[in-house]
Curated annotation (Swiss-Prot):
Any Pfam family the entry gives: Glyco_transf_34
Keyword Transmembrane carried by entry: yes
Enzyme superclass (EC): transferase
This protein's GO CC annotations: Golgi apparatus; Golgi membrane; mannan polymerase II complex
Phylogenetic placement of the source organism: Eukaryota, Fungi, Dikarya, Ascomycota, Taphrinomycotina
PTM comment, free text: O-glycosylated.
The keyword Transferase is assigned to this record: yes
Top-level taxon of the source organism: Eukaryota
Protein name in the entry: Alpha-1,2-galactosyltransferase
Subcellular locations according to the entry: Golgi apparatus membrane
Length: 375
């Protein structure tokens, strides 16, 4: 009987593992069912598949179809699947190879302007002004949404989720917009002369910066190494632009095309099953899950270098900010409790180029006092 405790422990661990696998598989089955419902709501985006596809399921959760790379697991089951839909390029009328500036919307959402305990509260109006004036300079539209007004839509969930219904509402509010650029509140536009159409969005430019066949960083939402971005992706097929860091996909800065494909992706992203079951990295983890498990999402997501749209305050030539980069994102500053320090570092850089005009009138004196060298 001396082995009884070990046997009991082994049984308990095995039960937990099998139970977790069952729960995860059941969740993914529900997500697949819900995804089909959402697809059916956007019927003009999809066309029927006429032939069956024989595929090997090498992961208990993921059906490997088309160009998606399969991964090897212990148990392998071969089956024949006839998908009901496959994605096609959206109408050319909404995939302009060189969108007009007037059809770009910069979206920002936060409650830091209301919350005196927010570490960036003393600088909130200047950050908003920085974003708005950049939009006005290039003829983009600017939309700021109060996160407190969206709290009821993510009750019981982490606040970063509010960006998804904000995207949904903005896409509806600006039906003629071509692209929505979401940039987190803990960021500053650093190069006011850089036009995001020329820098990222026009097809010939996007085709030069897409990271094709690059490995997605494994982690939250992407459980396996060796999963890569599409090999032959073309800008005309991209409806979602994002970047990744050492933790994987980072949703602090992203571009979403206001097309049926784009709206479908956002609708799936806000599926209640994701909100209820995904914690940790919240909306980032959910989006990673979508990319990894759903080929229809995978093929329309373009990954670009972090520095192109989402530079960090790192001493690193891959992720770190360099003079001339579009923006700086203080990623993780809440966790490291250094948001004010990050802001002031880049406020100093902006002031050396633009003086104090970028600051809000009510915050200018406070910021300038903080920027004075200590005696």
């Amino acid at each position: 009987m001396r082995f009884a405790p070990y046997l009991i422990s082994a049984v308990v661990i095995t039960t937990i593992i099998l139970g977790g696998a069952w729960w995860t598989s059941a969740m993914d089955t529900k997500l697949q069912t819900k995804m089909k419902e959402i697809i059916d709501q956007h019927t003009s985006t999809w066309t029927p598949v006429v032939s069956s596809v024989t595929s090997t399921q090498t992961d208990t959760l993921r059906v490997t179809i088309s160009e998606v790379v399969s991964v090897t697991a212990t148990l392998t089951e071969t089956f024949t699947a006839t998908p009901t839909v496959t994605s096609v390029v959206h109408a050319l009328a909404t995939t302009d190879p060189h969108p007009d500036n007037s059809k770009i919307v910069i979206l920002m959402g936060s409650n830091f302007q209301n919350d005196a305990n927010s570490p960036l509260h003393p600088f909130a109006q200047s950050i908003i002004k920085n974003r708005r004036e950049y939009a006005e300079r290039h003829g983009y539209k600017f939309e700021f949404l109060d996160a407190d007004a969206y709290a009821s839509r993510v009750t019981g969930h982490l606040m970063p989720w509010v960006k998804v219904p904000m995207l949904q509402d903005t896409m509806k509010k600006y039906p003629d917009a071509e692209w929505i650029w979401w940039l987190d509140h803990d960021a500053l536009v650093m190069n006011k002369d850089l036009n995001v159409v020329d820098h990222v969005l026009k097809h010939d430019r996007l085709n030069t910066i897409l990271t094709r066949e690059a490995e997605y960083k494994s982690g939250a939402g992407i459980p396996a190494d060796g999963f890569r971005t599409p090999k032959d992706q073309d800008a005309k097929d991209v409806h979602f632009i994002i970047s990744q860091d050492f933790n994987g996909i980072n949703a602090g800065s992203l571009f979403i095309r206001n097309s049926e494909v784009g709206r479908w992706i956002v609708d799936l992203w806000f599926e209640p099953l994701y909100l209820d079951h995904i914690q940790g990295y919240a909306e980032q983890q959910a989006f990673s899950h979508m990319v990894f498990y759903h080929p229809q999402v995978y093929k329309h997501v373009g990954v670009v270098p972090l520095k192109a749209i989402n530079a960090y305050d790192f001493d690193d030539n891959i992720w770190g900010y360099d003079d001339g980069d579009l923006c700086i994102h203080f990623a993780g500053c809440n966790y490291f409790k250094n948001c004010p320090e990050k802001f002031l570092k880049y406020a100093q850089i902006l002031s050396s180029k633009q003086g104090s005009d970028w600051m809000s009138a009510q915050e200018k004196d406070h910021i300038q006092n903080l920027l004075k060298p200590s005696s």
